[in-house]
Amino acid sequence: MNIHLDKHGQGMPLVLFHGWGFDSQIWQPIIPYLKPKYQIILVDLPGFGLTPMMDWESFKKNLFDQLPDKFALAGWSMGGLYATRLAIEEPARVQYLINITSSPRFISDIDWPGVAEEVFVNFYNNLSKDINKTLKEFISLQLNKMKFDFKIGNPPSPEGLAFGLEILGTWDFREQLKQISIPTVYLFGRLDPITPAKTMAIMEKNYPNFKYVLFNRAAHMPFLSHTDLFITMMDEFIK
């Protein structure tokens, strides 16, 4: 059981984790912008793309066997949960942590402005019916109807979608996040319907040592909707 990696360029290793329902192909449009400065390492998470299902410990061991000793790590949406857990458990390997429209807890509760679990359940049901149509509509909504030609290479497995749904509903790193001392940044989109921008105010209070960036006109995919701003932020953060 091998994790599928796709590498581009030379330089500081930058590992990218995709979000739920997608695979590493979602990063393809920004590779030309990152490749001159970084060695980009795209990862298909378990049950997505070309990576088979596996549990967390198998994923971590398999991944670390294929990665450099130290690297910067960026996770988008659900991928941010994977990235955060990796940084909490293996801080000696992760030099920088970048969370893109992600948070330590996705589901809302009485004192946390996440999203209702029904949103993910509905998305899951739509994905199960017509994955390409659902993903294209999702991207169109997040990019405010901006044209983006996304071709999904390998549809996620039903097990991958279900496991991802469980992760989004149950993983909660709000307490463990206080242990993180590596440089960490959280990126939010003011128009994001999935990771509400008001999460940022709570996080700034609870985790004052982290950096926070708000994309005023972005929704859930600022790396595609505002690529130039996103690349500038990455270059300023990763020294």
UniProtKB/Swiss-Prot annotation:
Subunit record text = Monomer.
Q: Where does substrate bind?
A: W20, S77, M78, F138, I139, S140, L141, Q142, H220
Q: What does this protein do?
A: The physiological role of BioH is to remove the methyl group introduced by BioC when the pimeloyl moiety is complete. It allows to synthesize pimeloyl-ACP via the fatty acid synthetic pathway through the hydrolysis of the ester bonds of pimeloyl-ACP esters.
- What positions does UniProt annotate as the active site of this protein? S77 (nucleophile), D192, H220
Q: EC number(s) in its UniProt entry? A: 3.1.1.85
State its location(s).
Cytoplasm
| Sorted UniProt keywords | Biotin biosynthesis, Cytoplasm, Hydrolase, Serine esterase
Q: Which reaction does it catalyse?
A: 6-carboxyhexanoyl-[ACP] methyl ester + H2O = 6-carboxyhexanoyl-[ACP] + methanol + H(+)
Q: Does the keyword Cytoplasm apply?
A: yes
What does the entry list under GO cellular component? cytoplasm; membrane
Task: Extract the Pfam families matched here.
Answer: Abhydrolase_1 (PF00561)
- Show the PANTHER family listed in the entry: AB HYDROLASE SUPERFAMILY PROTEIN YCLE, MONOACYLGLYCEROL LIPASE
Q: Which InterPro entries match?
A: AB_hydrolase_1, AB_hydrolase_fold, AB_hydrolase_sf, BioH
Which SUPFAM superfamilies does the entry mention? alpha/beta-Hydrolases
Pathway noted in the entry = Cofactor biosynthesis; biotin biosynthesis
GO biological process terms, alphabetically, are: biotin biosynthetic process
**GO molecular function terms here?**
pimelyl-[acyl-carrier protein] methyl ester esterase activity
Protein name according to UniProt: Pimeloyl-[acyl-carrier protein] methyl ester esterase
Task: Give the similarity note.
Answer: Belongs to the AB hydrolase superfamily. Carboxylesterase BioH family.
